[in-house]
Amino acid sequence: MSSYFVNSTFPVTLASGQESFLGQLPLYSSGYADPLRHYPAPYGPGPGQDKGFAASSYYPPAGGGYGRAAPCDYGPAPAFYREKDAACALSGADEPPPFHPEPRKSDCAQDKSVFGETEEQKCSTPVYPWMQRMNSCNSSSFGPSGRRGRQTYTRYQTLELEKEFHYNRYLTRRRRIEIAHALCLTERQIKIWFQNRRMKWKKESKLLSASQLSAEEEEEKPAE
């Protein structure tokens, strides 16, 4: 036994007036913390202490646990919640019928008539000169069969093109662009006009040469 620890069984005698202070000093007989019976513990009385003071009611029981506590009984549920649970169970059991969307042709046609122009409105729409295609006598460049209409030229445009063809049978791209800007035509229109004019010129030259040959032959026959 170590001399540093005081044996609690050994009687301790103190002077008069100091015996009341003895109960307030914790004396230990061994290395374990074992307070005297007069010293109150912070977590309730121990098994060997005096039970003069009752334990507080808010301390948890010694052997109780949170998982072992009995469930609280709140009494029967009100009628409102019981009816609500029954209605939810019935609604969950019944499955809604499948939804089959039907096309609404009348609405589609109505939307087209509202946001788009109908055939009658297109026909009745006035066509102003600035809305027409440049250098075209017809309001539309396509015929009733869907083919592109024949391009017509004014007298001034035809005269200028004939002058240019008289000097040059074939045009360079630079010259073709200049003529197109001067006559307010496209480069493609100038190119097509010259192609057609060359075909016509070849045909006329063939007819002219054939007529000259026939005339020469007629002149040679009487001479024979």
From Swiss-Prot:
Subcellular location, record wording: Nucleus
A GO-annotated cellular component: nucleus
Keyword field: Developmental protein, DNA-binding, Homeobox, Nucleus, Phosphoprotein, Transcription, Transcription regulation
Signal peptide: none
Pfam families listed in its UniProt record: Homeodomain (PF00046)
DNA-binding region listed in the record: 146-205
Main location: nucleus
PROSITE patterns documented for this protein: ANTENNAPEDIA, HOMEOBOX_1, HOMEOBOX_2
Phosphoserine found at: 214
Protein name listed in UniProt: Homeobox protein Hox-B6
Organism listed in the record: Mus musculus (Mouse)
